[in-house]
C-alpha cells in the first residue's frame, strides 16, 4: 500500500516574523543539524511514501527549494491565510483528490510539532483502521506559553468536534 504524508504549511507565519525570526517556522532548527521539516520527514523514512506539501510558495520565496523540490514530493500552492492547517487541507482538497486514490494510507503532520516514533509500531497500530489521529489528551505544557491551539473532543474514541486556534482555558 502506498503511503502519503501531507504537510500543510499554508499559514503566513506572522507570529514568528513578529518575533523577529527570518526563517519560516517549518525550517527552524530543532536538533543539531536538523530542522522541523526534516524531523517530520525522518519519521517516515522506512515507508514507501510520497510527500504532499501544501503552502503558499510565493511566501517561501524559493528559499527552501532544497527541501521541497524532490522526486517524491508533490507541491500544492494555496493562498496564505491565518485559519489553521485544516483550512489549508480544505483549500487543497481538489488537488489532494487528484494525487491520492482510494484506500491509500495517509498521514497528516502539522509543522509546529516535533516527535519521534518507531514507524513499524505505528504501522501495526494503524493496521485495519480507516482513520487514526495522533494527539495528546487534556492540558499540554506548551499551552502555558500560548493557549491558542487546535482541539478535538471525542466520545468513545470518535471525534465529535474540531476547533482550531482556540484558547484551552
What are these regions (language model features)?
Residues 2-8, 15-17, 29, 33-105:
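Conserved N-terminal catalytic core of the sugar/cofactor nucleotidyltransferase
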Residues 8-11, 56, 111, 136-137:
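Cofactor-binding loop segments of dinucleotide-utilizing enzymes, especially the Rossmann-like FAD-
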Residues 17-18, 62-65, 117-120, 143:
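Short glycine-/acidic-enriched loop or helix-start segments at secondary-structure transitions
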Residues 102-114:
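Short beta-strand-to-loop acidic/aromatic patch adjacent to the donor-nucleotide binding site
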Residues 115-169:
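Conserved core of the sugar-phosphate nucleotidyltransferase
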Amino acid at each position: 500500500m502506498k503511503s502519503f504524508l501531507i504537510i500543510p504549511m499554508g499559514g503566513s507565519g506572522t507570529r514568528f516574523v513578529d518575533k523577529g525570526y527570518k526563517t519560516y517556522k517549518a525550517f527552524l532548527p530543532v536538533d543539531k543539524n536538523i530542522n522541523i521539516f526534516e524531523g517530520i520527514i525522518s519519521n517516515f523514512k522506512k515507508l514507501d511514501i510520497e510527500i504532499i506539501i501544501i503552502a503558499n510558495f510565493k511566501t517561501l520565496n524559493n528559499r527552501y527549494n532544497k527541501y521541497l523540490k524532490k522526486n517524491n514530493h508533490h507541491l500544492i500552492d494555496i493562498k496564505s491565510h491565518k485559519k489553521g492547517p485544516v483550512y489549508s487541507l480544505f483549500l487543497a482538497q481538489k488537488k489532494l483528490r487528484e494525487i491520492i486514490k482510494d484506500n491509500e494510507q495517509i498521514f497528516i503532520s502539522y509543522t509546529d510539532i516535533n516527535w519521534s516514533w518507531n514507524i513499524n509500531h505505528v504501522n501495526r497500530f494503524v493496521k485495519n483502521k480507516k482513520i487514526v489521529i495522533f494527539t495528546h489528551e487534556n492540558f499540554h505544557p506548551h499551552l502555558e506559553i500560548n493557549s491558542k491551539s487546535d482541539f478535538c473532543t471525542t466520545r468513545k474514541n470518535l471525534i465529535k468536534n474540531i476547533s482550531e486556534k482556540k484558547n484551552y482555558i
